[in-house]
Regions:
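Short, conserved catalytic/metal-binding motifs centered on acidic residues
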Residues: 49
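Patatin-like phospholipase
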Residues: 1-46, 54-138
Length: 138
């Protein structure tokens, strides 16, 4: 028999929740299909998909991973972003009629580079809480 792979895409926190929910939905409706997906020989993920791949390859059951996604309490950080203000900020950055595309992108880069971020240890702790194991496999 050939090698089977499960490929998971990115999508940030929404991607993690969506992919976990889809897998749980498949498990609820088509258990044999879910087993085939979860027992893939290779798990590949980009960004959010890599987090889901790491989670489903561990010892934590899919149902518990799903329940963590829908729980009221979360270890995720609240970005504290006003989405409308962010939209206006980017719209202002790109709607300068005399600016070149490069200048518009540079303006967005300046905004991004000057935005406050969490410290590396805080971010690392959030990611560690998502993972079922902190040991690297052989």
């Amino acid at each position: 028999m050939g090698t089977h792979a499960l490929i998971l895409a990115g999508g940030g926190l929404a991607g993690i929740a969506w992919e976990t929910g889809i897998l749980q939905g498949i498990a609820d409706e088509a258990p044999a299909t879910a087993r085939a997906l979860l027992d893939s020989d290779i798990l590949v993920g980009t960004s959010a998909g890599s987090a889901v791949a790491a989670q489903i390859s561990g010892s934590v059951p899919l149902r518990l991973l799903y329940e963590r996604q829908v729980a009221e309490d979360s270890h995720e950080l609240d970005p504290g972003v006003d989405i409308e203000a962010l939209g206006r900020l980017f719209l202002d950055a790109v709607s300068q009629p005399d600016a070149t595309a490069r200048q518009k992108l540079q303006r967005i880069g300046v905004i991004a580079a000057s935005s406050p971020t969490v410290s590396e240890p805080v971010r690392r702790q959030v990611i560690e809480r998502r993972l079922p194991s902190h040991d690297w496999p052989d």
